[in-house]
């Protein structure tokens, strides 16, 4: 099959939600319906079934949250679907942002009892900023939940886009009878069961079929009135408006009971976009170009703790990847020929022979690749839009056993390169390493991973710093003068970019006034010292 045909088959999306909305459950059920797993949580492997929950890191298993990001690929209806699972805790917006730069659509999961929650709003803001098309799944209809019209109004208020229901619930909780497919004009009858795949589902055709009110009484009377209101007042689905981020199709169901999953999977194939062009500083890169390009959007350490490995997650931007092909790392100009390239189903890996635009490949990485690196067949390209945000929280870190100092530095270097934490090395001699984060849980995760993956018992200590700004200047002497005068507040991150550590907003304002030739940046792009606007 040629490159344009393969590109047209691809669908790459992420699931976004607030913790406990059912994201992990829906992830497993999508894999189940696509045939990638036999039962929820078990991979269909050649020799044996293996656990394949997307929550695979040890701390995730203990706490029931997604901290790392997993990649899963499945085939369904002659389409190749790449699912990127995002961190599900409110502290992990930066890592989640990096994942959302690698997808072409998002599936938003909402708990029907709680509505649109804070974490979902933050993720929606990222999607809206990128005009990412969003499909909405309102989950847990088998429980007592809020009125569906109220939920739609709330979604529209937070999203700033029209909702277009593709299905509508008949009843809720113990009275949940099923969902009415508005576009196909039929009702799918609800039956509980965690292993059912829909082959034996019962349908009743027609909103005016007397069988539905006979069986579902008052629940259907309310639902039918709401459906008529939707048909009269709601906007018709417009795929162009959806692709532009102006409409979201809405589905209702119960992921734990495999109900409504089929419709969502079909919508991903029928409505979600194939890979589109990606913008580099030099030019626009189209997915069907003959030559390969790809971007490292994540580096994950210790996916296999037994081997202390690091894997670079690369989204293919164009062309065809072949195992063993000669590639150039645009940042360094160095060549590499990756042979042990893998695809993923959560922690399980398989050797990969080829990949196309929007596929995610894993390249074993021993420090050669960094976040934001661009791989090409020789062209020098710099893709945009993969930033580090200035940390909002800081802690100093020391090792309890001085003999483990080297292991501490190795661990923090690897965790910093994968983006799990930001690590700053003070310019002043003898200063403790500083960790910067956007959420408190990141410190707990790093301490846990240092202990379990690197054998380092680290001590976290409060820091006086409240933020940081990366510093640059067109005048090297002006920059050096500023750094010398503020040596106690200067540190370097994992790519040796200089940063000014701040104790208060007033300190930053004074520095900006005294040193007008120095630029203070609230973000920097991965893979190089390309900085955003002053903030």
Swiss-Prot record:
Cell location: Cytoplasm
Residue span(s) of domain tr-type G: 8-278
Keywords recorded for this protein, A-Z: Cytoplasm, GTP-binding, Nucleotide-binding, Protein biosynthesis
Keyword Manganese: no
PANTHER family named among the record's database cross-references: PEPTIDE CHAIN RELEASE FACTOR RF3 (PTHR43556:SF2)
Function summary: Increases the formation of ribosomal termination complexes and stimulates activities of RF-1 and RF-2. It binds guanine nucleotides and has strong preference for UGA stop codons. It may interact directly with the ribosome. The stimulation of RF-1 and RF-2 is significantly reduced by GTP and GDP, but not by GMP.
Name of this chain's protein: Peptide chain release factor 3
